[in-house]
Every structure is written in C-alpha cells, then in structure tokens.
Amino acid sequence: MVSKPFQRPFSLATRLTFFISLATIAAFFAFAWIMIHSVKVHFAEQDINDLKEISATLERVLNHPDETQARRLMTLEDIVSGYSNVLISLADSHGKTVYHSPGAPDIREFTRDAIPDKDAQGGEVYLLSGPTMMMPGHGHGHMEHSNWRMINLPVGPLVDGKPIYTLYIALSIDFHLHYINDLMNKLIMTASVISILIVFIVLLAVHKGHAPIRSVSRQIQNITSKDLDVRLDPQTVPIELEQLVLSFNHMIERIEDVFTRQSNFSADIAHEIRTPITNLITQTEIALSQSRSQKELEDVLYSNLEELTRMAKMVSDMLFLAQADNNQLIPEKKMLNLADEVGKVFDFFEALAEDRGVELRFVGDECQVAGDPLMLRRALSNLLSNALRYTPTGETIVVRCQTVDHLVQVTVENPGTPIAPEHLPRLFDRFYRVDPSRQRKGEGSGIGLAIVKSIVVAHKGTVAVTSDVRGTRFVIILPA
C-alpha cells in the first residue's frame, strides 16, 4: 500500500485571509447583483410607463368612432413622428398590417421570437431581438437599435363587440442595456481592485492580529531547563489565547515537577549507591592494609556480600519502578483469595515479628480479587515490613480485608508514633523519609512504599495513608 505524501495544512493566516476575503468579496458581488437587478427593474418600469403613455395617446385617436380609417392613420402618423426610438404597427381584425412606422420594418414580423419580459412587474410585456436599425440616441447622433420592449393591445371602434385594430408598440431599450453593461463592467473593475485591496488589508490585519501569538511563542522559546518556574501571564494576552496560556502553564508546571523529581531521584540514587560503595572500598582497603587471618577475611567478604545484596535489591527495585513509569508493568491476573495471600506474607514475617515482640493478626473476609499474586504479595510485604519497623514491642499489627460495593479494601494498621500531616502526601515518593537521619540504620532503601503504589495503580486501584494517635493505616482499594 502506497502511503500518501504528507501535506502540511495551510497556515492560519492563509485560511483566515481566504475566508474573510471570500466573505467580503461575496458580499460585494451580492450588493452589485442587487444593484444591477434594481436598475433593470427600474428601467423596465420606466419603459412600461412610456409605453402606457404612448398607447393611451394612440388609443384616443384610434377609438374615435366618427373618423375614417384614412383620417385615423394620418393622425396616427403625425403623433408617431413625435416619438423617437419607438416603432408602431397596426393590424386590422383580419390580421393585415394597415400601418407601421415609416422607414422601418414591420415589427409584427419579429413577434414570433418575442419572449416575456421577466423584469416587467404585471401586464403582458415582451422583449424583441430585432429589427436592427439606426435611430436617434439619447445624446447627439444616431445609434444602432436592435433590442425592444413591446406591448400589444386591441384598439379602435367596436364591431360585433370587438375592437377593429390590434396595436403593437415597441420601445428601444438599447440605451438602457448599454448603461447596464457599462455599469456591470465598472462594478467588475471595481470589484477586482477592491478584492486585491481586501486581500492585502486582511493579510495585514491577520499579521497584526497574530502578534500576541508571536509574543507568546517568543516567551516560550526563552524558557529553558533553568527557567521552569517561569509562568506566562494570561492577563496579558487576548481572551482567545487565555486558555492556551493556562494550558501551557499547567504543562510547564508538570514538567517542572517531573524535572524536580528526576533531579532529586538522581541525587537520591547516587547518594544511596555511594554509601555502600564507600563501605565496600573502605572495608577492602582496611583488609588489604596488612596481613589478615582467614577468619578476618571471611568477615570482610560477608560484610561486602551484605552491601552488594542490598545494592542488587535496590537496582532490582529501581528497574521495577522504571517499568511502572513506562507503563510496562502488566499484572498477570488470576482470581485470588486475599486471606490466603496475607497468610503467606504472615508466614514469611513470623520469625521477625517474634524477635521484635510484635503480634500479626488478620481480620475480615476471604476477599476475592483478580490480581497478580507475586505483585500483590510484594505490596503486602512492603507494607508489613514498614509496619514492623515502626511498631513498638508488645503491640499488634492488624491486616483487615473487606468487600464494599464491588471494591476490595485491604488495611494494614499498626500502632506507633503518629506521622505529621505534612509528611503524609509524600510518603509514596521515592527515597522520601520522615526522619532523614535514620536512613542508614536499617531503615530500607526508601522506595518500598513507591513500589506499593506502582503495584496498586497497575491493578487499577488506589492506596492512601492516614495517621493519628491510634496508629498509622495504609488502605489499598482494588476492583473486585
């Protein structure tokens, strides 16, 4: 399958210029069309009024009952000679032409090609193309006339109840047509010039209107990794850009938070690894500074092995968290009885709990949940290890399990010194410790709770912590 070549969308300036110019030019042409149509209707009304005046004058002559036909025609010719740009034809009741304008063809010969006049408002008015002839124009001299507006009407004395004549009157409209054509040409030329001006003005206006966008772009370009605390002021941009600026501020805030976490994380991991490496180097240098017995060398090796094991666990935990960060932590789910899983964790920590004089107790139902058994046991182990670390001798750690509204809630509760409220939101951060001075006194690597959160989130659940004088409670909620 051949992929289509990438086609970059038109710029905003181009699109805005096109649509605004198109709308403006369309409006101008609509105005021009209305003007031309109005002029046509006005000329049609003017011509019809002229035709009606002429027909009324001729009717008075032709309707006179006491005149002979010869007398009527003589009077008709005298009247017609006073009109310019008008052709007359008179037919009797048998359809024979008894009179037509002298020096001109009989217009009745052209009536078969007549078409109704759409611009005429009311009445039977027709348009004729022909005859073509030279006649006086509205100015000086003569001009060619070939387009006519015509009416016909019965006139003359009544015979058997019907007029004896049919009168045809045609008025030249060439001057009006020439005027309309000139007007259209001028409007087209004006429209062309105006269109060019509109495009230029719109381009200039769009360029000017995009100035705030360019200003915002320059401000964004000036932000570097050292300026992540900089925020754009939404009050200094047009309202259309306010949401964009707010979204950018939110994004840069998240980037700053991630960048800060990453920097702190790098510093913390360097510190965590530096200490055991320093211990290894120091112990090895001491061992090599003089001859040692086999027992002393074995003690050094065992101590080094302990530090290396701790470092290996830390690296494993960090790889686990890296998978979680990249959404690569995919649980292999199956139906589990959480009571059984808690029991397995209790078996693992039973000896340590006895040494510390702490009792482990499970309270609740046999909650069923779909989850990865290894991951969930690891999360429970981290919470229980944390609880054992801070529970006074003679106290009891309680793990509760219950199902509420299709959700499984697991609570690990231990008595002890309450945690200050300002520390609670950060307990699940990597390497965060409430008391930094205790970090090298067997207090773990500081990422156990971060692993708990990653596992719970991978199971589409949530984890929270509360602490007061009665103790500290970690609550995991998972979908049943």
UniProtKB/Swiss-Prot annotation:
Post-translational modification: Autophosphorylated.
One GO CC term on file: plasma membrane
Pfam families associated with the record: CusS, HAMP, HATPase_c, HisKA
Gene3D superfamilies to which the protein is assigned, alphabetical: 1.10.287.130, 6.10.340.10, Histidine kinase-like ATPase, C-terminal domain (3.30.565.10)
Signal peptide extent: none
UniProt xrefs under SMART domains: HAMP, HATPase_c, HisKA
Keyword Electron transport: no
TM region positions: 16-36, 187-207
InterPro entries, per the entry: CusS-like_sensor (IPR048590), CztS_silS_copS (IPR006290), HAMP_dom (IPR003660), HATPase_C_sf (IPR036890), His_kinase_dom (IPR005467), HisK_dim/P_dom (IPR003661), HisK_dim/P_sf (IPR036097), Sig_transdc_His_kin-like_C (IPR004358)
Function in brief: Member of the two-component regulatory system CusS/CusR involved in response to copper and silver. Acts as a copper/silver ion sensor. Activates CusR by phosphorylation.
Protein name: Sensor histidine kinase CusS
Species of provenance: Escherichia coli O6:H1 (strain CFT073 / ATCC 700928 / UPEC)
Organism lineage string: Bacteria, Pseudomonadati, Pseudomonadota, Gammaproteobacteria, Enterobacterales
